[in-house]
Amino acid sequence: MFSSLYPLARASLFKMDAEDAHHLTLRALGAAGRTGLACALSARVPDAPRTVMGLTFRNPVGLAAGLDKDGAAIDGLAALGFGFIEVGTVTPRAQPGNPRPRMFRLPQAEALINRMGFNNHGVDQFVKNVQAARYRGILGLNIGKNADTPIERAADDYLYCLERVYPFASYVTINISSPNTKNLRQLQGAGELDALLAALKDKQQRLADLHGKLVPLALKIAPDLDDEQVKAIADTLLRHKIEAVIATNTTLSRAAVQGLPHADEAGGLSGRPVFDASNEVIRKLHAEVGSAVPIIGVGGIFSGDDARAKLAAGASLVQLYTGFIYRGPALVAECVKAIARERAA
């Protein structure tokens, strides 16, 4: 039902400020989930099970982190047919993020630019929201560092968040690739990443012993990487036996949107313009890690064919964000059906 109404809703939402529209939509989804009205949103999406990271996904099409930073609308989002949901990024302490305006639509390019800056209510409130959700599907919890934490102490923030979210996560994503937190992408450097992942894997094992379950770790990386950087990241993932990698986050490049309104705004660009760059990183990663580290492909998926292209490049699962905002819930079913047809052929 909601899928058929979304084009009308989008016309109204796109007349609003982008962030205001985002918050309005999340509040509506959150209310639907809390009141049981989520059944009215329910999308008819076929099951297409896939096992990755030792987890069985209802279907291989998930929601990327960033849409629901505080985990406040999990049940409403779950009704839209996603095979898995990722919420966050969350930080140890609440923080306001960057000053507004900080989210911009580029409809001519079917893109968004955001410089949100990990605005969230902090990990304690995040955990309460996750615990309150009735959803029992695959739930990824995405963690980051506070803006005022020195980069040299970043590991402390990740370790703290990992400990807090671990009991409630199907998997945990380590976000080191947002361009909107100063110096965060430095953690993608070989030495920095090696030290961070060593600390996280040690903490993961201790938490697994404590809770009696091993929660997989995924690393989210940027598209703005050269061949040498991709190889170094791949080597580090293999060395530390990281369970998955998410490729990719938003890009700093503006090559595809030059001259468009808002193109010069600072922040990360997402949507169609990042599709090819994301696929290239996926291909390069897959060439290095093979099946040892599953890849979750995200970036510029607007159709079933786009989702299939991510899998052809080497991804095992895909996630939607900007395409979901532009096309709505119908995109989820389209992607699942396209992937299922490909596998049946």
Swiss-Prot record:
Keyword rRNA processing: no
UniProt subcellular location: Cell membrane
Catalytic activity: (S)-dihydroorotate + a quinone = orotate + a quinol
Swiss-Prot/TrEMBL cofactor(s): FMN
GO molecular function, a single term: dihydroorotate dehydrogenase (quinone) activity
Signal sequence, renumbered to the chain: none
UniProt entry keywords in alphabetical sequence: Cell membrane, Flavoprotein, FMN, Membrane, Oxidoreductase, Pyrimidine biosynthesis
CC terms in the record's Gene Ontology section: cytoplasm; plasma membrane
Residues annotated to bind FMN: A65, G66, L67, D68, K69, T89, N142, N175, K220, T248, G271, G300, Y321, T322
Active site residues according to the UniProt entry: S178 (nucleophile)
PROSITE patterns linked to this entry: DHODEHASE_1 (PS00911), DHODEHASE_2 (PS00912)
Pathway in which the depicted protein is active: Pyrimidine metabolism; UMP biosynthesis via de novo pathway; orotate from (S)-dihydroorotate (quinone route): step 1/1
Keyword Cell membrane: yes
Protein family according to the UniProt entry: Belongs to the dihydroorotate dehydrogenase family. Type 2 subfamily.
Assembly with partners or alone: Monomer.
Name this polypeptide is given: Dihydroorotate dehydrogenase (quinone)
